Amino acid sequence: MATLIYVDKENEEPGILVATKDGLKLGSGPSIKALDGRSQVSISCFGKTFDAPTSLPKATRKALGTVNRATEKSVKTNGPLKQKQPSFSAKKMTEKTVKAKNSVPASDDGYPEIEKLFPFNPLGFESFDLPEEHQIAHLPLSEVPLMILDEERELEKLFQLGPPSPLKMPSPPWKSNLLQSPLSILLTLDVELPPVCSDIDI
């Protein structure tokens, strides 16, 4: 870490040298440069370098001091004006809110027909039963394969069959021919491959 320290002659101690601990450990001595009647001490070290802010001459300090004082005075003069403005705008805001309250229609009178459009019964969403005409509780559905039915007539035929038995099982009305016998499916998947050449040495 390198630090730059300026020593003013006004402080009556121009010979002060400040070194960091790293600089003392490394054995690097500080170097002094003279700039405009001031002595500058710079210490070089390894790692990140940070520069201390340079001190300004008295003339610039006075100039900045007067600028700062001028801005403080302007802030003080603007302060009371800002306090008066909110009170003026508060009157306008109260007038606007009164006008808005008069212009907004009452919520009770507006749109009563919308509430009647959608009747809502929360108990209706808790029942998971099918209607009586579509009850399937009397059918033994264990181990029944998925069937895709074409029309309502086939559905009626299925209900007229009664409980299924392994001895009297009619052919189900399948919609597609995807569930064919395994041999027919394997025959469609057969692909002719080129003959194997046994003459080629591997």
Swiss-Prot record:
It is found in: Cytoplasm; Nucleus. Residues 69-106 are annotated as: Disordered. One of its GO terms (biological process) is homologous chromosome segregation. GO terms for molecular function: SH3 domain binding. Keywords: Cytoplasm, Nucleus, Proto-oncogene, SH3-binding. Expressed in ovarian tumor and tumor cell lines (SK-OV-3 and PA1). It comes from the Eukaryota. GO terms for cellular component: cytoplasm; nucleus. A motif (D-box) lies at residues 61-64. Pfam families: Securin. InterPro entries: Securin_separation_inhibitor. A motif (SH3-binding) lies at residues 163-173. The N-terminal destruction box (D-box) acts as a recognition signal for degradation via the ubiquitin-proteasome pathway. PANTHER family: PITUITARY TUMOR-TRANSFORMING GENE 3 PROTEIN-RELATED, SECURIN-3. Belongs to the securin family. This is Putative pituitary tumor-transforming gene 3 protein.
